[in-house]
Amino acid sequence: MPAATRIGDADVPHCSGMTRAAGSPNVFVNNIPWSRQGDNNTGHLIPPAPCPAHAAPIATGSTTVFVNGKGGGRIGDGVSGCTSVAAGSRNVFAGP
């Protein structure tokens, strides 16, 4: 099972690095808000040049674990038109 992702955890970088910027107001993983399907990452640059700035939400989350009615975000989940989640908790995991 993939690890749960949280605010501050990294996404796979492409033109510049980015981290999870949004999460649940009341569900926490290791005392950090759990980032869910639809929650954005920090603003970052996307190729090709001139690398326009944008932010993107988690496109897919868990289909069996829900956080405030949204799929819980996990390492490997896709980020809309962008990349994927790269980092998460070392000891909290969420199913498919």
Go through the PLM ranges and name each one.
Residues 2-96:
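Intrinsically disordered, low-complexity proline/glycine-rich segments
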